[in-house]
Each structure stands twice: as structure tokens, then as C-alpha cells.
Amino acid sequence: MRRVRVGDEVIVTAGRSKGKQGKILRILGDERVIVQDVNMVKRHTRPNPTANKPGGIIEREASIHISNVMLYNPATEKGDRIGFRRLEDGRKVRYFKSNDEIIDV
């Protein structure tokens, strides 16, 4: 089970996008994530007439190392550390370490 999942709200803790908040769009391998509207880069693309795509400068999200994001805790309105716990019925769930609130229900 991963500490962060697609759709989780995270805060960037390091780098040029430090302090920004967004949802995880994709997880690349074991170490990198793409966060919505964070770490934006510009890519220059050529026009492709066969695919009917115009050229130009496109702005998109670049990946961030997973150690540079923390899960956003709405109760404390900050980034928070994550722990794992087993419930009475045997399910493994994530919880916030600061206030013991369960994330996965």
C-alpha cells in the first residue's frame, strides 16, 4: 500500500513549487508523482498536420519526487505524515499521525 494515491490532495514541501497544493494525477514508477498545476514546465512542439495538432509552446506539469510531497490534512490545514494501521475487521488503512484521523474508510 502506498502512502500517496491518485486523487490525494498533497502539499509540495521542497523545490521551486514549495507550498503549492494540488491533486495527484499520476504516479510514475515508485518514486515520482505528477501533481495538478504544480511544477509547470513549457514544452516547444512542432506542428503535426497529419494528426491535426498545431505547434507552439505548451505548458504542462512535470514530475516531482515523492519525498517532496506530503498529504494535506484538512483538519490541521497543513501537510501531515502518514501511518498505517489495521482495523478490527483486518483491513489496512492509512491515518494522519498528528491527529490519528483515518484517511481510508
From Swiss-Prot:
SMART domains: KOW (SM00739). Keywords: Ribonucleoprotein, Ribosomal protein, RNA-binding, rRNA-binding. This is Large ribosomal subunit protein uL24. One of two assembly initiator proteins, it binds directly to the 5'-end of the 23S rRNA, where it nucleates assembly of the 50S subunit. The keyword Metal-binding does not apply. Pfam families: KOW (PF00467), ribosomal_L24 (PF17136). Belongs to the universal ribosomal protein uL24 family. CDD domains: KOW_RPL26 (cd06089). GO terms for molecular function: rRNA binding; structural constituent of ribosome. It comes from the Bacteria. The keyword Repressor does not apply. It comes from Nitrosococcus oceani (strain ATCC 19707 / BCRC 17464 / JCM 30415 / NCIMB 11848 / C-107). GO terms for cellular component: ribonucleoprotein complex; ribosome. The gene is rplX. GO terms for biological process: translation. HAMAP family: Ribosomal_uL24_B. Part of the 50S ribosomal subunit.
